[in-house]
């Protein structure tokens, strides 16, 4: 659908998109994908990204969820140009603060005949359908469109409180969806719908398109679960244009569903849906956003990895695929791992330090050289992890209170053959003056491989298990340097005693 002015002529405008979540529960990855696509399109076109909070449901909305939404967007780097805590020319940007605006709009719709009061109860609607031989579940039958004054007064006298319904047009409603192509709802398939409850409280069906119109939104880009509401909203835009409260009908694009297991939409009950669960595991924003972008869009056929800047340069909503996309945790993990590897070492160390601090992790390093030691430790694991949380399992051996020798590792490596290896290792390391990775590697290779004539696997396996407690660890010689001379020798000696006692 081409954007039009009030006189029906095409009008070009700077792109204005909006992301308008409801503050309920925790942020869902499907919702984040919608925010990302809107943000990327605004940045690609040089437009404006508006954040609007749809908090008109007092029973479900919460301040905690509202703050979680802001936290999520900030962590991901999806900054908004207008909205809460930023301001803008069309505020306020929380719908709970716009009640007077909605009352004014409804009053004008009623005064011009675009909307009307409706008194029919659901039971009355069903009975009328039955009497006419129709399916009683067809929904509202537009009965109250043309009530006489006498009928209106009689209903009021009964104490009935009416809802307000929009008068739907007597013609098909079509639009050129930017993702799905031409979409049409035939006349009669969408009945006159409710704008306000009998209490006067506005519904989503009113406030969403009303705010889009008043905030001059040019593109409504959202999930396909809202597709069925679009003909209602198009009709309301048309009415708002006629009463002089809107300039245009925005363009629409409906993104494909994000699926979980099987063919079902990814449910909030599934752990993969929870944005913060991914953050807690140690996803970095670049990795998660890259993967979410792949749920319906691709930068090119031959590669899946890209930066946010590269996405902005390439993203166009018309390139979004209309087919449902399945959330694949293994694929998401793989993408995140690649982005971790692409970070420079200082950046990675800083992020890992922040992650450890948030989760109460602390690795024991030389206090006099802690920062350099942490960077060195981070470098050892950067190419070996999928999420930041994996680093703790690899580095916690540096803490004496976390260190213990795994029983399976001991059974495999600390057998009788390990005794001579550990004896020689303790001797040469105890006399080593230069406690550096290169020196540690040199003396151990000379003494054990050349001196004892053993293969590397036979000599370094016992030392690795003795020093780290595990079969898999960061590089051995670097790990010994980080442990320091005293703790390394203490652990190797304790492991040697374990071999003897066995």
Curated annotation (Swiss-Prot):
User: What GO annotations for molecular function exist for this entry?
Assistant: ATP binding; glutamate-tRNA ligase activity; tRNA binding; zinc ion binding
Q: Cellular component GO terms, alphabetically?
A: cytosol
Which biological process, per GO, is one annotated for this protein? glutamyl-tRNA aminoacylation
Q: Where is this motif: 'KMSKS' region?
A: 265-269
Q: Which InterPro entries match?
A: aa-tRNA-synth_I_cd-bd (IPR045462), aa-tRNA-synth_I_codon-bd_sub2 (IPR020751), aa_tRNA-synth_I_cd-bd_sf (IPR008925), Glu-tRNA-ligase_bac/mito (IPR004527), Glu-tRNA-synth_I_codon-bd_sub1 (IPR020752), Glu/Gln-tRNA-synth (IPR000924), Glu/Gln-tRNA-synth_Ib_cat-dom (IPR020058), Glu_tRNA_lig_a-bdl (IPR020061)
* Disulfide partners: none
Residue numbers binding ATP: 268
Give the record's keywords alphabetically: Aminoacyl-tRNA synthetase, ATP-binding, Cytoplasm, Ligase, Nucleotide-binding, Protein biosynthesis
Q: Catalytic activity annotated for this protein?
A: tRNA(Glu) + L-glutamate + ATP = L-glutamyl-tRNA(Glu) + AMP + diphosphate
Enzyme Commission (EC) number: 6.1.1.17
Localization annotation: Cytoplasm
Motif 'HIGH' region positions after renumbering to this chain: 21-31
User: Which family does this protein fall into?
Assistant: Belongs to the class-I aminoacyl-tRNA synthetase family. Glutamate--tRNA ligase type 1 subfamily.
Quote the function comment for this protein. Answer: Catalyzes the attachment of glutamate to tRNA(Glu) in a two-step reaction: glutamate is first activated by ATP to form Glu-AMP and then transferred to the acceptor end of tRNA(Glu).
- HAMAP family per UniProt: Glu_tRNA_synth_type1
Q: How does it assemble?
A: Monomer.
Its protein name is Glutamate--tRNA ligase
Q: What is the lineage of its organism?
A: Bacteria, Bacillati, Actinomycetota, Actinomycetes, Mycobacteriales
